[in-house]
């Protein structure tokens, strides 16, 4: 089953971004600007017109080599740039690490961020109910937290110009954007994250009544 056919899973695309800083030269060039969706990552509608991938995250970069005959090829070296990963030891290697890029790297890093969300959620459940997160609720809660803090705000204008569409249309082709984990797990005087959990049947619903903080009611602001 390919990620594009996923219905309930969280599919992850790759941003052309990492924390290395090598420079271009006359033959080795960047494929796209840093921070843009990677050419290695597919975009568009998935199974039954669902949006896939759901989120994007750091997927590393690799240079493109300009050949003498006018063609171009990806450089697949395990040296910088890229995402630093554990790797089998090679001849002459002392650290067992290598630099890779792609959607698998992005998915691995999102898993790491999901673990952060899990620790926060589990602690909240222990404090409020005396027990941790129920196993049957873990996946849906983590998906909600990762997606809730996601947006295209850092590169929305630049990306919309490249695609020839308005920033509001980006989610129809590229999903929910780039997760901001700190925004979800931390609250401020002007921002809170509410977590609701339960089950509803067909034609049923739940009504939540919450007091509005003073800092919210005294000014106009965007709410997500």
Each language-model region and where it sits:
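Loop/turn elements at helix/coil->beta-strand transitions in domains of secreted/extracellular proteins
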Residues: 7-10
